[in-house]
């Protein structure tokens, strides 16, 4: 059976956040993080529907008043002890699209132009044999564990950071994958995901108060090199 190109964008927002309380509705731009993300997605071409999945009545009200689908998340899927893959199975049951795009409110610098680019690239890459698309940013820095250096040598063998092996930071900004494959993988992207590279501003991801303050500063700046 041939898949359609219908895409459901899912904004997953939990009411409780241990590291940064109420992080999904913190003030951002001209509104709050959740509403900011909804307004960004409304400008994206090619979306069949936008869903906010939350256990928070306050967040669902924001989504509903903004004119998107607001679906109350069952209590068991708001519990962090429940495997992420089980929550994804539930998501696959509530979406109409043949493809799911994960769109986190905590990635506020992922702008409409980036979503549009990702969607076009995603369908191209599916034809080339990739199974999904994720956003990553290049990551070249010195890494250590408790035993010492992981990706560099000390002494005369030391290299400048730009000479280190290229690693990739998975940003959580955009994930795109076929709905039925997500159900099969119990994950929101697959083993042959195409890595769409984005810059540090676009990769901003809010997990704690430091991330939040940095994201506000990055959003306020004019991006000198947007991924277009």
What are these regions, as identified by a protein language model?
Residues 57-101, 113-117:
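Short phosphate-binding loop-to-helix
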Residues 2, 83-86, 169-228:
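Conserved alpha/beta core of the MobA/IspD/sugar-nucleotide pyrophosphorylase nucleotidyltransferase superfamily
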Residues 108-200:
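Conserved core of the sugar-phosphate nucleotidyltransferase
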Residues 53-54, 206:
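Short beta-strand scaffold positions
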Residues 103-105:
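Active-site acidic Asp-centered loop
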Residues 3-53:
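N-terminal glycine-rich phosphate-binding loop and ensuing alpha1 helix
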Residues 47, 97, 127-131:
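Short, high-confidence coil segments that cap the C-terminus of an alpha-helix
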């Amino acid at each position: 059976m041939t898949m359609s190109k219908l895409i459901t964008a899912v904004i997953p927002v939990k009411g409780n956040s241990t590291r940064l309380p109420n992080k999904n509705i913190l003030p951002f731009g001209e509104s709050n993080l959740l509403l900011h993300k909804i307004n960004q997605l409304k400008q994206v071409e090619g979306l069949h529907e936008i869903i906010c999945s939350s256990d928070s009545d306050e967040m669902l009200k924001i989504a509903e008043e903004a004119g998107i689908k607001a679906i109350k998340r069952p209590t068991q899927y708001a519990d962090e002890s429940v495997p992420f893959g089980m929550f994804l199975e539930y998501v696959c049951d509530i979406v109409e699209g043949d493809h799911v795009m994960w769109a986190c409110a905590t990635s506020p610098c992922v702008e409409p132009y980036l979503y549009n680019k990702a969607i076009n690239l995603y369908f191209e890459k599916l034809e080339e044999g990739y199974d999904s698309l994720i956003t990553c940013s290049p990551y070249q820095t010195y890494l250590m564990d408790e035993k010492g250096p992981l990706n560099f040598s000390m002494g005369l063998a030391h290299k400048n950071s730009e000479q280190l092996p290229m690693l990739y930071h998975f940003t959580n900004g955009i994930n795109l994958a076929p709905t039925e494959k997500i159900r099969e993988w119990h994950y929101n992207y697959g083993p042959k995901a195409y890595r769409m590279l984005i810059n540090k501003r676009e990769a901003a991801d809010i997990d704690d108060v430091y991330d939040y303050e940095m994201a506000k500063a990055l959003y306020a700046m004019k991006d000198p090199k947007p991924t277009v």
